[in-house]
Amino acid sequence: MQYERTLSTVWDDLLESLDSETRDLLDVLAFLNPDCISEDLLRGKPDTTSGNLTVNNSFRLTVMLSSLIRRNLLERNITTTCPSLRMHRLLQLTLLLNLDRRQEKRQEAFDNAVRLTRDALPRRDMTSRLPQFDAIWKQHMPQVLSLQAAFEQSNLSIAAGFEFASLLADAGSFLWEHRLNRIAIPLLTLGEKIVVAQLQEGETHSVLASIENFLAVLSAYDSVEDRRLAMQRLKRVVQLREGILRSLPDKTATLEQQIDLGRAWNDLAYIHADTEEFEEADQGTAKALELYKSLGDERSLRFRFAIQYQSIAAVRFGQGRLTEALDLSRRSYELCKSELGPRHLETARMEVEWSYVLIGAGDLHGALDRLMDALAVRSERLERDNPAILNTKYWIGTVYHYLDQLEEAEEYLRQAIEFGADSDLGKPDLARSQYRLALLLYEQRRWKEAVTFEEAALSSISDEEQATIFCDGDGRDKRKDITMEVLDRRVFLQNGRSTGPFRGERTGKV
């Protein structure tokens, strides 16, 4: 209490000198990221900050901001590329503490902050990915995270509805595309909680289906056990999507609503492919493709066909139908590149997944070219410890290992594990990379170091699985192969596999 009183004393005189409109604006800003509030965000749609402030009265907004800057309640960022403001964190805390004592004002300010942010951010359309919106999402993502924190940390509950949940769902989608899973999952979990609280028993809503879908896919990276839960969640998503379409009058479903159902079928099918249930995977991917063909073609729905071809390619790869898998992977990459351009993250993902099939076909140099291209794109767009970059480096190191270029292989494999558990790289992926490096070190007779990495990798699997390896493995080399296959199968299929049904026609090292 003494701390709160001290903070209030610092700012009270200045706050009391503000007119009501300017104070309302400051309360809204308190829910946003204090380090960088874009002025473009404030000049959004009419009536988003108070009853009198509108985009048509830009001059009035300028006057209010000037007043706040003059009183040192805000300051301009001079280092940012676009006009933005900064608020002292102690002032932000004071404003939020004051709002916690004024429930009606707090709710109004929060709703307006949500509306400002929602209006500034383009809605994520799963029909395609529009690359021109990426910069906008990246610029304003801190505001979404600030709203999430304010909502969760408020002393009193804040009401939130579908608009905020939809914003969280879209943010989760963007973060997943950038493989920022640790940030995305709490956002989506909060969105799910908000939507469920709004729905009556038996009710469905598209926002809930979207959130469930993203949570299922995100959780699939963590462990085999989580992928089993993801399969159950995706079955619910299919039911939700089918229920939404059934509830609509005939021929009134939008293109996106129908595509959302196809996505749900496809994502569930992909999890079946991950667990090597290829018959179910084949049925689900075919069902989604048939739906897309009824809605458009490769020209009108290029992105969705690209995604679908890549999913079917993974199934064909696992079925041993390599010629089909290679053709589908190539078409997937080309469609994605023509839709989004060669430097988009989704294009890079299609290129990496194409490389998995090339490895299975024994075209190691072709795979290496694809992986190097994708690494260049990902390194340009993502941080060094991003799991997409680390996974690409694992595969580059693995291809070099297959080519007996051990020095290059070691370099990339060490880079793949250098951040360890501190990155978003899933535990199964880290263990696989550690064991691949151990195999390389064993080849070089660097026993002590090899054992260290081998033990680290084996610590990620259960005693029962380790016992199975030693029972089935007749001889040291056989045990190494079985261990690599066990660790490889624990990795989510989207991150690639090179053993079991996904070994393909390649011969030589496991």
For every predicted segment, state its role:
Residues 20-21, 28, 111-190, 194:
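Extended alpha-helical scaffolding segments used for macromolecular assembly and cargo binding
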Residues 134, 158-162, 199-209, 226-228, ...:
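Helix N-cap/loop-to-helix boundary motif
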Residues 11-103, 107-122:
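C-terminal boundary/linker of central alpha/beta nucleotide-binding cores
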Residues 148-149, 192-200, 235-250, 286-297, ...:
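Amphipathic alpha-helical segments of tetratricopeptide repeats
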Residues 137, 181, 225-227, 278, ...:
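TPR-repeat structural position
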Residues 166-177, 206-223, 256-274, 300-318, ...:
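Conserved alpha-helical positions within TPR/SEL1-like repeat arrays
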Residues 1-2, 43:
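Amphipathic helix/helix-loop-helix segment enriched in hydrophobic residues with interspersed Lys/Arg
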